Amino acid sequence: GVQKTEVEATSTVPAQKLYAGLLLDIDDILPKAFPQAIKSSEIIEGDGGVGTVKLVTLGEASQFNTMKQRIDAIDKDALTYTYSIIGGDILLDIIESIVNHFTIVPTPDGGSIVKNTTIYNTIGDAVIPEENIKDATEKAGLIFKAVEAYLLAN
């Protein structure tokens, strides 16, 4: 089955800076901005571009231990970025993959809007409990706010 969420957030951080900080440089920034979120992220396949697979060890803010991420698409001109979670205990044994697609849109005031579509592809007709999706969306919001605060301060 497929379950989908769409979230938008506004920021005073300029679009290019937010794109770099939230997506391209997240492995460097997140441990500084929100150390409870991830302990480490290591590339296990690829060079950091499309097709790269990373093993992320999650921090104490998560009830899960690991997730394996694959970078599916990067478009620095359009400010879009897509990655999939393809492994780890975060998939609960009922999810095949979680696809995250981000678009950062510049706003006239020099800030930006982040649009995030998350597609949960479950195994067979498994259904992810609504509270799990709500929890994941809230955690993503906390990560966004932590990265935004870090970028505003640096």
Curated annotation (Swiss-Prot):
The keyword Hydrolase applies. Its EC number is 3.1.-.-. Transmembrane segments: none annotated. It is found in: Cytoplasm. SUPFAM superfamilies: Bet v1-like (SSF55961). InterPro entries: Bet_v_I/MLP (IPR000916), Bet_v_I_allergen (IPR024949), Plant_def-hormone_signal (IPR050279), START-like_dom_sf (IPR023393). GO terms for molecular function: abscisic acid binding; endonuclease activity; protein phosphatase inhibitor activity; signaling receptor activity. It is an enzyme of class 3 (hydrolase). One of its GO terms (biological process) is abscisic acid-activated signaling pathway. SMART domains: Bet_v_1. It holds the Pfam family Bet_v_1. GO terms for cellular component: cytoplasm; nucleus. It comes from the Eukaryota. Gene3D superfamilies: 3.30.530.20. Induction: By ethephon and jasmonic acid. Keywords: Cytoplasm, Endonuclease, Hydrolase, Nuclease, Pathogenesis-related protein, Plant defense. Belongs to the BetVI family. Catalyzes the two-stage endonucleolytic cleavage to 3'-phosphomononucleotides and 3'-phosphooligonucleotides with 2',3'-cyclic phosphate intermediates. This is Ribonuclease 1.
